[in-house]
């Protein structure tokens, strides 16, 4: 799999980026050690592995907005990641991007059986949806 060349200028600013991220979210919600980031070097599609620039695990919508706004202003890429179970490669980390881990946002907000529609936060897994609807004869 051919991935884009990382922006070395962003990588060189990594320490300062992580310091600022720790001002936007609780300090323990920023992961920047190589060892700790190994858990985030792939999604369910593990054929491609890459450590991200940093991992941010926000706890509130306001924290997400603050991180997104600041990264946009600084020209820093963000890779959003739900539960990390995707097999499509849609949440593959990049060396010059902040991985925004949204696994804490794991609530099913609405199930509309008539319209066959579920509204869920990004950390909800397919299995969680299946378990929520299976008693009513549905499967996802």
How should each PLM-predicted stretch be described?
Residues 1-44, 73-76:
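N-terminal accessory segments
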Residues 21, 46-78, 96, 102-140:
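N-terminal glycine-rich flavin-associated loop
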Residues 33, 81, 101-103:
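Generic beta-strand/beta-sheet core signal
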Residues 38-40, 100-103:
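Short hydrophobic/aromatic-rich motifs at helix boundaries and adjacent loops
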């Amino acid at each position: 799999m051919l991935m884009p060349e990382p922006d070395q200028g962003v990588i060189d600013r990594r320490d300062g980026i992580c310091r600022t991220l720790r001002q936007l979210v609780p300090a323990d919600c920023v992961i920047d050690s190589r060892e700790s980031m190994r858990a985030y070097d792939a999604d369910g599609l593990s054929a491609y592995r890459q450590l991200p620039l940093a991992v941010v695990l926000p706890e509130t919508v306001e924290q997400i907005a603050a991180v997104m706004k600041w990264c946009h202003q600084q020209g820093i890429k963000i890779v959003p990641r739900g539960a990390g179970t995707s097999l499509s490669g849609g949440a593959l980390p990049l060396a010059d991007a902040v991985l925004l881990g949204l696994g804490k946002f794991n609530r099913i907000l609405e199930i509309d059986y008539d319209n066959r529609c579920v509204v869920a936060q990004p950390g909800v897994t397919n299995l969680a949806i299946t378990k929520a609807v299976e008693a009513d004869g549905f499967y996802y």
